[in-house]
């Protein structure tokens, strides 16, 4: 079922990389031995966003736990490291002068964080069209116009409006995974510096995250709105005759070798 819905998303949205199925795991022994692990197969620790990039670009199924990840911000979001006074102080030292003008400003972000408080031990990340897991979250890296179509599709069935938050940082892990899980609502994610520097996200990319249990709603709406005429690629209106600014038109006609003049005369003479 999820494979079919993944193919529908690829058909109607045409993302440049695979939509991702992300499954949370309670225990490490739930991970099959043949799934790739950064610590086992790559012989290193890395950032979570790097694994999103490898899965969506290479088509790999990747499993991670805290043993695989050395991103302190991600470890705090997933609850793999406790939030202590020392952790808070480190985050403030990191932010002040970079993301915030002072400690007081930096600390305001904590009021808006969604943390998973060690609710699970890891993630399995797999391309949706060939997913080996039932997703808790589906992540689609896309262009803004593609995100528009995903939003239209979801709201076709649900109505109302989607509400998003953004801090310009901690995008895929915080808003893409944690907030989507805790609110059970789709999120439009402005990917931050981590996603772009280490996670390989392009300048043009954003991300749309959908709870796995609501993927059917999204796909139903995509199909219906596509049939009604809302499409991607956007069918730009082309049924018009081009022209020039008045000050440029005379010179343009000369440079066109008479083509524009003859064309106009053709229609005038019937």
For the regions a language model picked out, list residue spans one by one:
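Acidic, serine/proline-rich low-complexity intrinsically disordered regions
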Residues: 3-270
């Amino acid at each position: 079922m999820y494979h079919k819905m993944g193919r529908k998303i690829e058909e109607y949205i045409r993302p440049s990389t695979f939509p991702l199925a992300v499954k949370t795991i309670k225990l490490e022994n739930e991970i099959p031995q043949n799934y790739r692990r950064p610590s086992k197969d790559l012989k290193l620790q890395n950032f979570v966003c790097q694994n999103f990039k490898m899965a969506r670009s290479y088509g790999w199924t990747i499993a991670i736990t805290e043993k695989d990840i050395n991103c302190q911000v991600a470890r705090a979001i997933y609850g793999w490291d406790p939030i202590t006074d020392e952790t808070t102080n480190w985050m403030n030292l990191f932010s002040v002068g970079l993301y915030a003008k002072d400690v007081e400003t930096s600390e305001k972000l904590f009021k808006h964080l969604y943390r998973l408080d060690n609710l699970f031990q890891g993630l399995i990340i797999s391309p949706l069209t060939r997913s080996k897991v039932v997703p808790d979250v589906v992540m689609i890296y896309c262009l803004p116009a593609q995100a528009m179509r995903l939003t239209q599709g979801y709201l076709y069935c649900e109505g109302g409006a989607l509400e998003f938050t953004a801090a310009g940082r901690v995008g895929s892990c915080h808003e893409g995974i944690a907030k989507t899980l805790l609110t059970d609502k789709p999120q439009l994610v402005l990917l931050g510096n981590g996603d772009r520097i280490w996670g390989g996200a392009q300048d043009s990319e954003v991300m749309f995250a959908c709870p796995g249990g609501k993927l059917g709603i999204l796909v139903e709406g995509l199909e219906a709105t596509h049939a009604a005429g809302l499409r991607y690629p956007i069918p730009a209106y082309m049924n018009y005759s081009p022209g020039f600014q008045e000050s440029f038109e005379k010179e343009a006609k000369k440079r066109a070798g008479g083509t524009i003049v003859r064309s106009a005369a053709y229609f005038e003479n019937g």
